[in-house]
Amino acid sequence: MAITRITAAEAAALIKDGDTLGLSGFTPAGTPKAVTAELAKVAHAEHEAGRPFQVGILTGASTGDSCDGVLSIENAIKYRAPYTTNGEFRKRVNAGLIAYNDIHLSQMAQEIRYGFLGDVDWAILEACAVTDDGKVYLTAAGGISPTVARLAKKGVIIELNAFHSDRSIGIHDVYEPLDPPSRGAIEINSPGDRIGTTYVQVDPKKIVGIVECDIPDEARAFKDSDPVTEQIGQNVADFLMADMKRGIIPSSFLPLQSGVGSTANAILGALGSNPAVPAFNVYTEVLQDAVVDLMRQGRVKTASTCSLTVTNEVLKGIYDDIDQFKDRLVLRPSEISNNPEIIRKLGLIAINTAIEVDLYGNVNSTHICGTKMMNGIGGSGDFERNAFLSIFTCPSVAKGGSISSIVPFCSHLDHTEHDVNVVITEQGVADLRGKSPAQRAQLIIENCAHPDYKQLLWDYLKIAEKGQTCHKLSAAFAMHDTFLREGNMMKTNFAEYVK
């Protein structure tokens, strides 16, 4: 029996105030775009009529403007989890208008299954193909699709997006683990292993309709690297090469996980162009253009990811050359791509971005000056805590030098000193392995802080009260406070904070 075709507007009309939506995708890759855009129109009309209309949003990670963006503008999001990068959403979260739950991405699907986040009313999945018996072939991301499709109480809506070629069928490995106490080992022992199906199986009776559309992904090209990011990339490559020469990293190398953005591109470029680095595997949550280039060059052998967060030109190139990629590229649900068991088993080298790092190696990767959410923790906690080698990178300064990324005490903590092995800026490398707090502070100031801030950070240590971890609590956030008052951390005078 053929599944009914409906319009995006008809699908949106099914969704009621207070419903919770579980969406496919992970980053803008693979996320619904047609139905959510129509849902924003519904919210606008309801609000104009004086009626409430807000929904809960559960996703794999961030979405694009046609979801988080338009729904935020129309004040249509009551609650959302987890990670997001949308500017309109960010404004409203920081204004206290949206309840935002910043969950580790590996935990998202299981927290839904455990009932921690309430019921899922509707699942909306983007697909490149769907069969009458309910086999849904996802597009450019795995996300939380298997879980929300299975648990959706009111029904499943499929966006059949012609932009995505059905030639990509076969790159997904869809696997949903059992919940405790029945969960067993996840039998992935190398990045290319496959343990699931190539599709999400949905009870066809639950599919209320298929919305046909042809809408490109909303992934953005990252800005070009600059001398600072290039130097960070080179510092990372040099550090890893030194660890290889010491025999800490095996000569065959280890699978790499890297975040996204210009710094990640610079790191991958430096590793890929270094002849001393053997061809390596990638086990990550997000694949960007640089990895695809390295796969074409033979520098990356196999890549496992949750999403293809690439430009549309690169995505089309993958589809056109799918025979080159199908056996070397695996897309997984986020609870598998980010799974701590697998990360530790494979021995990943994890490289992620910090907003700020304090003198003892704690990392803030989510908040500006302790209060304003930037994006969220994403998968960085999944990877960094469980990796063979945990690396955080950042420029030593921001805002033209008015902010030091190295501070006495992080204004928000996402990754504790116990989970951070190495800190790298364009200034150098602080290898924190085996070091005491006092030793870490010395290394971070000397090797990672910008020269304009080194003396200020030494001055803080002079007034810090002695202990295992030396601090002066009245002055620990003096640099942040000075920035908020005067717009420049360099104007900090610790004497004003000593009582």
Functional labels for PLM-detected ranges:
Residues 1-499:
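Conserved alpha/beta enzyme-core scaffold
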